[in-house]
Structures are given as structure tokens and as C-alpha cells.
């Protein structure tokens, strides 16, 4: 099925141009790329991406069918119509300073293939018949460029696979079970911090401050859902979801703060080897585990003064929305950055992690002066 290139407008509210920004005034183009899924083995899938246009494109791999990380590339339904549990990672990538290695170049009429084993990120041990489909959005740059100039929505064909459960069960999981040898410290009986991973005092202080700021931002955002309808509609589109959005913000505030028991574990460092280039932090939703990466500390301020920019507080908020222990169903990465997040339908926005992080950051810039100081 073909992909329609969607070119969204820049926000008049955002101070800087983010790495995924799409310039205002660029018209909607013709269908330019095609994504086709095909079976390549028992649980192996091949995605073929074709550039139907007359000019070369640079396609950003992050959060797309081409992502080299074990992210959710397809939705999988079993024969009874139930979605198969995802056991991979949900990373938050840095928006800025995009490197050429983050892109795949596709010449006019050219194709690129990307294969992945769905058994490495899904429990297919029951075996049987499954239906797969991929949809998302690919940020685009010009040939040899790294400046995002557009984005292509894609909806693949449906792929039907008959999978041998025993063979699928023998495939090594991309992200194993988290093992801890050290103690856990619960912040006010909420999010547990894995102290074994937090031997660096500065990293522990930064994470503790980010959790406190996340609690404050989320609490204020929950109030603003009802108090500022214009802002709510900008991000979430439909008033019928206001209670759901407010409830999720309240749940994140509770998980981040000091009231009663919570269900996530937060790690200062990467124990599962998920911190590839460009990854700020990531979540394993099947285990309710969150991990910070080195650039979370080196490249992000505690809380940004710039509208819709990334920082430690809203990155932590973003990651907590990915955890089913915070609220179910947990959030996906349906649209990344302001332009892509605000272009989502209401149904997609209410389940999009960045919509919550951007709403909190974009609405509450005065919070930068209220950020809890590090201990």
C-alpha cells in the first residue's frame, strides 16, 4: 500500500526548530514510497520500502519499520483477534544533532529491505495463525541531508503468517529479563530506584530531581486539561478523551511522587544494552522497567526553558507513560516531536507518549523556576 507524504506546519509556539520539525507551507506531495511486508521464515518478516518519487530521499530510521533497535515495528493479532504482547523496548530518541548514520538513503525508484524476527520482540510460543500490519510515519530529509523537510505516513499490506510456536520460542529475546543484585530504594513509596545502577551520585541526584519535576509537571498538566480547553484541543483534539488524559497525568504524577506504592523500577544506567546512538532513555513495558542512557545526563538540561524542547524531567515523564503499571493501556510512540504529535488523530494522540510530554513542557514553562533542586 502506498504512503502519502504529510507535511505538517511548524508550531508558532515552539522557540527552537527541533530535529524532527517540518517547515510551514510545504504542500502535501504525491505518493512517494511504498511499504510491503512479506514472510521470510517461520517468524522472520521482510519489509520492502520503495521510493516511487523522482528524487532521492534520506529516511530517518528512528521509530519506523527500519529502526535497528528492537522496537515495535508491526502490530500482531492472533487468530482470536487479540493483540500479541510486545516484549521489546520503547526508546526516546534525541531530536537534535541527527547524524548521517541515523538515515537510510533511497534513490529514485530504488528499494531498501529491512528484515526482523518478530519472535524476538513478541511471545509467539502458542503458535498458529497471526495477522501483521505496519503503520507509522517516516521523517524525510533531502539527499545526503540530515535536516527534516517532510514526513511520510505509511500503512503496509496485511501479512498473514502461520507460525510454529516451538520454533518461535527458541528465538532469543531481544531484551531479556531484568536481573538485579542490589537493593531498591523507593522514592516516597513510589517509583523504585535500582541503587545498584545508581552508584554515580550525580546521576542519582539528577534522576531524583527529574522524578520530582515530573510529578509537579504532571500534576499541573492534569489540572490544565480542564482549565485550558484550547491547549488541550491543540494536543488531544477531542474533549471526549479529556478524562483519560487527565487520569494518565494524575497516574504519572502519583508514580513520580511521594504518596503510596507504585509499580515501576527506574535505573540510572543501561543494564540491558539498549542505549544505542541517539537514545536518551528507554522502557521495557512488558517488565515496567525504565533505563536512562548516558546522553540523558550529558545532553539534556534538568528542565528546558524552550517550548517543546527535550529535557530530563519530560523525558522521565514520557518514559513513565510507556509503563502499564502506571496506566493501561500504556502509551505508544505514534508521533514524535511537536509537529508529528499534533498531526495525530485524537485516538492516536491519547495513546502517544510524546503528546503528554509536549503538553506538559509546552504549557508550563514557568515550572523551570520551580524545579526542585537536586539533593
From Swiss-Prot:
Name of the featured protein: Neutral protease 2 homolog MGYG_00813
The enzyme's E.C. designation: 3.4.24.39
One GO term describing the cellular component: extracellular region
Signal sequence, start to end: 1-19
A GO molecular-function descriptor: metal ion binding
Cystine crosslinks: 198-268, 275-293
Function text: Secreted metalloproteinase that allows assimilation of proteinaceous substrates. Shows high activities on basic nuclear substrates such as histone and protamine. May be involved in virulence.
Family of the protein in this entry: Belongs to the peptidase M35 family.
Residues annotated as transmembrane: none
Species this chain originates from: Arthroderma gypseum (strain ATCC MYA-4604 / CBS 118893)
Keywords, comma-separated and alphabetical: Cleavage on pair of basic residues, Disulfide bond, Hydrolase, Metal-binding, Metalloprotease, Protease, Secreted, Signal, Virulence, Zinc, Zymogen
Ranges in coiled-coil conformation: none
Amino acid at each position: 500500500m502506498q504512503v502519502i507524504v504529510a507535511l505538517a506546519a511548524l508550531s508558532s509556539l515552539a522557540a527552537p526548530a527541533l530535529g524532527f520539525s517540518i517547515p510551514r507551507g510545504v504542500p502535501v506531495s504525491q505518493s512517494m514510497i511504498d511499504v510491503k511486508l512479506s514472510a521470510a521464515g517461520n517468524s522472520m518478516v521482510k519489509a520492502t520500502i520503495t521510493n516511487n518519487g523522482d528524487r532521492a530521499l534520506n529516511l530517518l530510521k528512528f521509530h519506523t519499520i527500519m529502526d535497528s533497535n528492537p522496537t515495535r515495528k508491526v502490530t500482531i493479532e492472533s487468530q482470536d483477534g487479540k493483540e500479541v504482547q510486545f516484549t521489546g523496548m520503547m526508546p526516546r530518541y534525541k531530536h537534535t544533532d541527527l547524524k548521517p548514520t541515523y538515515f537510510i538513503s533511497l534513490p529514485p525508484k530504488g528499494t531498501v529491505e529491512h528484515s526482523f524476527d518478530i519472535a524476538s520482540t513478541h511471545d509467539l510460543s502458542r503458535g498458529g495463525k497471526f495477522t501483521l500490519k505496519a503503520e507509522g510515519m517516516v521523517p524525510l530529509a533531502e539527499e545526503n541531508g540530515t535536516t527534516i523537510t517532510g514526513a511520510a505516513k505509511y500503512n503496509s499490506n496485511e501479512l498473514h503468517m502461520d507460525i510454529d510456536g516451538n520454533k518461535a520460542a527458541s528465538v532469543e529475546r531481544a531484551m531479556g529479563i531484568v536481573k538485579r543484585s542490589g537493593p531498591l530504594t523507593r522514592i516516597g513509596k513510589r517509583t523504585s530506584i535500582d541503587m545498584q545502577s545508581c552508584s554515580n551520585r550525580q546521576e542519582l541526584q539528577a534522576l531524583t530531581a527529574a522524578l520530582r519535576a515530573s510529578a509537579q509537571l504532571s500534576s499541573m498538566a492534569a489540572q490544565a486539561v480542564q482549565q485550558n480547553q484550547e491547549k488541550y484541543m491543540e494536543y488531544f483534539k477531542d474533549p471526549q478523551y479529556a478524562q483519560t488524559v487527565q487520569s494518565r497525568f494524575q497516574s504519572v504524577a502519583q508514580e513520580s511522587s511521594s504518596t503510596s506504592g507504585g509499580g515501576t523500577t527506574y535505573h540510572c544506567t543501561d543494564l540491558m544494552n539498549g542505549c544505542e546512538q541517539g537514545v536518551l532513555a528507554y522502557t521495557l513495558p512488558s517488565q515496567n522497567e525504565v533505563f536512562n542512557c548516558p546522553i540523558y545526563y550529558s545532553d539534556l538540561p534538568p528542565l528546558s526553558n524552550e517550548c517543546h524542547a527535550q529535557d530530563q524531567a519530560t523525558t522521565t515523564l514520557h518514559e513513565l507513560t510507556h509503563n502499564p503499571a502506571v496506566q493501561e493501556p500504556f502509551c505508544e510512540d505514534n508521533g514524535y516531536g511537536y509537529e508529528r504529535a499534533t498531526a495525530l488523530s485524537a485516538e492516536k494522540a491519547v495513546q502517544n507518549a510524546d503528546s503528554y510530554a509536549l503538553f506538559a513542557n509546552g504549557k508550563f514553562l514557568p515550572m523551570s523556576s520551580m524545579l526542585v533542586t537536586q539533593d
